[in-house]
């Protein structure tokens, strides 16, 4: 089922009890709130679908895996109610992933920032390429990575989470693999896809 709008898209295909859930957005696969809501709903639907055993979560294109939440929407937040609504979008996705009754495998082909790192951490098993660098840049814009912290800390530990939060430089895919975020890292997307199939 394809769910499309000007704020990005979701596409779900089911074959041999494997659901492939692909998201995309022109701004480096970032998530406006409407796309976060659709992703939450689709994860809940797949969790309840008896025809599905495994979910492969991936993003479109060959660039970034996910640039996190929509920066334009963040800049538009002007009060506490809007802030709560904005940050709840990613929290709802991460909770849907955590509560999902299916195994979620992340196919990580490129860079991830902020909420994108949270999505990777919420996957049960994440496979990546050497291009799949990660970064938490929240402090650089005056906020903390509070929404994704529980998921990321569970996956890589408090020490690595603190390092990522305070040292906002890019971390390599090998670093992420050593910390437990990625189960395996491949040299190419073709090798990544061969492992998944």
Label each PLM-derived region with a short phrase.
Residues 30, 63-67, 114:
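Short active-site-adjacent helix-start/loop capping segments
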Residues 32-33, 91, 109:
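Amphipathic alpha-helical repeat scaffolds
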Residues 42, 89-101:
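Catalytic-core regions built around general acid/base machinery
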Residues 96-197:
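Crotonase-fold acyl-CoA enzyme core
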Residues 1-58, 95:
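Conserved CoA-thioester-binding segment of acyl-CoA-metabolizing enzymes
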Residues 59-93:
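Glycine- (often His-adjacent) and acidic-residue-rich active-site loop
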Residues 21, 39, 57, 70, ...:
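Terminal peptide-recognition signature
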Residues 26, 61-63, 110-111:
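Short glycine-rich anion-binding loops that position phosphate/pyrophosphate groups of nucleotides
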């Amino acid at each position: 089922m394809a769910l499309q709008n000007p704020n990005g898209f979701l596409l779900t295909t089911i074959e041999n009890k494997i659901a492939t859930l692909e998201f995309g957005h022109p701004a480096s696969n970032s998530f406006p709130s409407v796309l976060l809501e659709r992703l939450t709903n689709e994860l809940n639907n797949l969790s309840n679908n008896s025809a599905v055993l495994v979910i492969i979560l991936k993003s479109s294109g060959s660039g970034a895996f996910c640039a996190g939440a929509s920066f334009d929407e963040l800049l538009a937040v002007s009060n506490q109610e809007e802030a709560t609504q904005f940050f709840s979008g990613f929290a709802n996705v991460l909770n849907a992933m955590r509560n999902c009754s299916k195994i979620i495998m992340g196919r990580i082909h490129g860079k991830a920032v902020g909420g994108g790192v949270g999505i990777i951490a919420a996957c049960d098993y994440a496979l990546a390429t050497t291009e799949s660098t990660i970064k938490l840049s929240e402090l650089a814009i005056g906020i903390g990575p509070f929404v994704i912290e529980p998921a990321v800390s569970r996956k890589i530990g408090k020490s690595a989470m603190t390092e990522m939060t305070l040292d906002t430089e890019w971390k390599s895919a090998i670093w992420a693999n050593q910390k437990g975020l990625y189960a395996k890292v491949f040299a190419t997307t073709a090798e990544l896809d061969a492992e998944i199939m």
